[in-house]
Amino acid sequence: QPQQIHVHSASVDAPGWLNVATPNFYRLHETTDFSSDHAFLVGTPIQIGHHPRRRRLVLNILVDALPWEIVGSCFAEMMPQTARFFARGLIFNQQFSVSEYTYPSLATIETGLYPHHSKMFHDKIPVELSSSIATLSEHARDNGYATAQLMGFGAGLYDGCMRGYDRLIAAMYRSPAYEGTERIIRHLDGMPDADHFIYFHTADAHPWTAPLFQQETAV
């Protein structure tokens, strides 16, 4: 059953509801009091707004298991639409991963550190990222961006690599690009006046040896 709350501000004095199965987001334009007969948790407020010195959208896309040393030689042939898009930007051909393994590579993307400095090198050896190390998403949030990871697995929730994101949607197994793209469109439509820093981790190219047992999250 949803939890009833009461919302009070200078312009609103009415009951409301909390969905107990998912985080609830309320957009506030003025000082607002929330009250309820039952306990509820309040997260860190998300700053929303545009500044001319910020980009409207910074979109960080990680296509897991897409090897450039293979795709690079036939990029325009195999991925024509992607090739046309990046023809107007920069392609770094001398960019190398710190590991042929996703877990430590994600930590490097977020921190800029080698695994022997971040201590993130194996998901079966739990190490929390030092609080003295600022992540890429924390820098973005400190500079006024609304930060979100709308598709990606949740390992970074426990080791601290994803601690700078205001909103996270974790999918540990199935993460198709079409579903993540829809989430991004809905997210941008919901906050058109914000400056966004969005991380999008898709695994369409990643080989899976196990059967696809997971239901689509959109269902």
Model-predicted regions and their roles:
Residues Q1-V219:
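Catalytic domains that recognize anionic headgroups
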